[in-house]
Curated annotation (Swiss-Prot):
It is found in: Virion. Gene3D superfamilies: 3.30.1920.40, 3.55.50.20, Bacteriophage T4, Gp27, baseplate hub, domain 3, Trypsin-like serine proteases. Homotrimer. Heteromultimer with gp5 trimer and gp5.4 monomer; this interaction forms the tail lysozyme complex that creates an extension of the tail tube. The T4 tail lysozyme complex is made up of three copies of the proteolytically processed gp5 and three copies of gp27. Part of the baseplate macromolecular complex which consists of gp5, gp5.4, gp27 (central spike complex); gp6, gp25, gp53 (inner baseplate); gp7, gp8 (intermediate baseplate); gp9, gp10, gp11, gp12 (peripheral); gp48 and gp54 (proximal region of the tail tube). Pfam families: Phage-tail_1, Phage-tail_2. It comes from Enterobacteria phage T4 (Bacteriophage T4). GO terms for cellular component: virus tail; virus tail, baseplate. This is Baseplate central spike complex protein gp27.
Amino acid sequence: MSMLQRPGYPNLSVKLFDSYDAWSNNRFVELAATITTLTMRDSLYGRNEGMLQFYDSKNIHTKMDGNEIIQISVANANDINNVKTRIYGCKHFSVSVDSKGDNIIAIELGTIHSIENLKFGRPFFPDAGESIKEMLGVIYQDRTLLTPAINAINAYVPDIPWTSTFENYLSYVREVALAVGSDKFVFVWQDIMGVNMMDYDMMINQEPYPMIVGEPSLIGQFIQELKYPLAYDFVWLTKSNPHKRDPMKNATIYAHSFLDSSIPMITTGKGENSIVVSRSGAYSEMTYRNGYEEAIRLQTMAQYDGYAKCSTIGNFNLTPGVKIIFNDSKNQFKTEFYVDEVIHELSNNNSVTHLYMFTNATKLETIDPVKVKNEFKSDTTTEESSSSNKQ
């Protein structure tokens, strides 16, 4: 008969490799038994960081140069067959000495590609997913096995020479990408599962993750017998925010371009708030001339004006973008919540997951702006040169 693990017990492995060669040959130091704290933080809008602290009784810090690879594998309590693994690099590390004279190493964790901060200088593809794969392929070309998993969708972005970093490209995709299959704006983020993409329709139509709200001390050892995971310390950071929500109900979006003399508009309500978007330069390659991409994203997300946080026992299945429905005896939670940020806090014998979520305080309205197809000539230089050669 197998023993049940205590709820929140992390099945944790933390392996320290001194190089890619050591990783390839599985030559490592196991740190799980020596850690004091491990924090992993991921958000829907591009924040990925972590902190690892562990006792250094063997003076490992004297041999470290900051180019180490940290491989973290975790699994929920009583779910050891569902192990999730991610690779971190070392942004920087420090060493302190405690009251007993023992060394404690603190490593700020980050993805290897964000630490290297490689700046590109080349065009990629109009498909954002293909560009992401190509960028990571370049960054990890000398250590291909470390490349994070990529879960992409077909999303169009203007095809321009990219002269910045991978992280800035993800921000660019969030701002301008349009899913080819749905004409909806796109979310792209990184977490323990890799680099992920989904459009707005995918987010709202996904299967919800049910949780119940309660107090762990009242449930005690029976917490593992609950049908759904328990959320506690639930706090509304913002229950309703008309200051951010309502201006988008009374706005006009002007799409200005230096390539023609027209200024198409999208108006909601009386249109008293002015928003100017560009259709010049790279933005002249957008799918729609009238600012549809910006309008649907701004007007839709402005409706999600509620923000809340809660905690639960360590649950590594919860990642950014997950849809959650809460149940409680008083029926206080009437809307669906979407995970904006996840923070996992672990020691070598316990774990807690903190969730930050957005939701809507008022009834959601369907946003469907008019579409005006972009008819700019995207390759005028070639056309002019061809016509002059014919003459």
